[in-house]
Amino acid sequence: MKWLVGIFAVFLLCLMIYAGSAFVSALGLVSAVRSGDAAQVMTRTDLPRVRHSIIDQVMAAYLDRLGQKRPVRPFERMAINAFGATIADDLAIKLMTPENLSVLLKTGTVRNAAENITLGTMSSLADLDISNIFVFVGRIKLIKPVEFALRLGESQDAGSVSMHLDGTSWKLSGIGLPPKVLTNMVDRLPTR
């Protein structure tokens, strides 16, 4: 019986360390965003994963848009996935510069500063109330044991961020854009 209690206590301790490390990393990211320190935001970001998450969302929204007007044939779907990812990757690279990423997380404005284009807004990470732990925990959705999503607000247009366990710390690994922002991004892509 003592072994069972000991094993359970060790399990609870490991679970608390796991959850605590996620909370501390999220708190560090929010602090870096609030201070406007782009260098700190970038050190707490897995940029290739964030770009990939943007590309996946843009490609899915693009295929949905094409499917609304007419059925997308399998060959078209394959071509869009092959060549469209290049176009979406170019868009994601422009959106995920250190300056644009810092502005997105701090103000919620999705923009391309190089072309002076604003694509929409979402809730900002800087406005997230981390002082109320119960609200914070209520917004977490576990995706995998090493990744979670954090909703930035209550509405669908609020958006979300994902954090991934990278070694011993958690890093920003994705940004869930609201449907309106994705629609604005897809409208800038060619239809053929």
Which residues fall in each region the model found?
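Alpha-helical transmembrane segments and their juxtamembrane interface "caps"
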Residues: 43, 139-140
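Short extracytoplasmic
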Residues: 38-68
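Hydrophobic membrane-insertion alpha-helices, especially the h-region
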Residues: 2-21
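Soluble, non-membrane globular domain cores that form compact, hydrophobic packing
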Residues: 8, 27, 190-192
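Alpha-helical transmembrane segments of polytopic integral membrane proteins
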Residues: 17, 23-26, 47
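Structured, soluble extracytoplasmic/luminal domains of envelope-associated proteins
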Residues: 74-132, 136
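Alpha-helical transmembrane signal-anchor/signal-peptide segments
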Residues: 25-40
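Short beta-strand edge/turn micro-motifs at domain boundaries
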Residues: 109-112, 117-126, 135, 145-191
